[in-house]
Amino acid sequence: MDSIAGPEAQWQTSRAKALCYRGPRYVTGADLVRIARTLALEPWHFTQTAPAAANDPTGVVLDNARRRVNVRVANAAHGCVFHIRTLEGTGRCGLGELAPVSCRMFPSVPGGNTEPAGEGGHRLDEEELAAAERQWIADRDHWFELVARWNTLAEKAETPPDVQDFQRYLLEAQAAREAGTPWPEDVVA
């Protein structure tokens, strides 16, 4: 049954209005790689770019430094491409626990309970929220470094790299991170 009554309905509604209809904003490379691996899809099949500010640490340099973009989960007419709309007009995240960490954290409230928030998830309690925040911070810091390293490489490239080249680098760099090995460019340098 899709209907949820009481506080859980309010929680799901606020989550959908804030994130699902607009698409997740604070997605890291680790999130994109985890989704890509699980769905057996290259990241460019479910991501899109948006203009990035000059000082944005997630701004990926493309086209011989003529463009800076953010790479994010794509939006469809109804919001995030993974947002599944029900016949009643409500929605659910089609990724469940695979969703980006920032999506799983929002809108968790310190002191919340772990009762189910509907199919496929639950509200995070304080300990789970703290663990998710630590994971997100580590992923975010790695994402910032990954983008900075890519931007340095892109400036030196003989042919202008595109967003798919960046995402290939992302897949390699995340694999290196998980294996505890050096960055891809440090191995071949």
Kindly give the residue locations of the regions a language model identified.
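Short loop/turn segments that flank or connect secondary-structure elements
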Residues: 1-189
